[in-house]
Structures are given as structure tokens and as C-alpha cells.
Amino acid sequence: MAKVCFVPAQGTLAAYLTGEIDHHAEQALRREIDAQIDARMPELLTMDFSGVTFMDSSGVGLILGRGRQMSGLGGRLVVQNAPDTVRRMLDLAHIHYV
């Protein structure tokens, strides 16, 4: 089961993800992250994947969707601390938010 913990700061929102991100977990994560973005309207969203042990294509969709959402708000997304398993998925999808 995946979880997300948020650390807001002025103009930024950090989302620390842990666990396995699959199609079951993605929906709940998306709702939680979107609610925080809507409430805080950050200029920068940082998604930290250091605690993620597995990610399938649903995780790729989670990242792409948050990137589009941040772009629509005039902000940006940074993906950081992706373990090798996650980085391989990002490379296959040609995601360069890192």
C-alpha cells in the first residue's frame, strides 16, 4: 500500500511517497496530491520517490498528470530520489522531471 506525506513551504509542496504504486494505490494518491495542490496552489511540486519500492505504469500516469496540472497552474514539477526500479520506468516513458 502506498502512502504520501506532505511538507508545505512558501510556494512549494513536497510530496514524499512510500510503498508500492500500482493502479490500486494511484487513485488514492492522485486524489490526495490533487487536493493539496488545489488547497495550496504551489509554484513547485516536488515528488520524492525515495520510499517507493515498486511502480508500474500507473505511477507514470500519476507523474504525467501532476506535471500537466502544475503546468496548467503556471508551476512546475520535480521528481527526485527515484530508486533504480522507478528510474527505469521513467526512462522508458521518457519522463525528465528529474
Where are the regions that the model predicts?
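STAS-typified acidic loop motif
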Residues: A2-R31
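Amphipathic alpha-helical interaction surfaces in cytosolic regulatory modules
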Residues: H23-V98
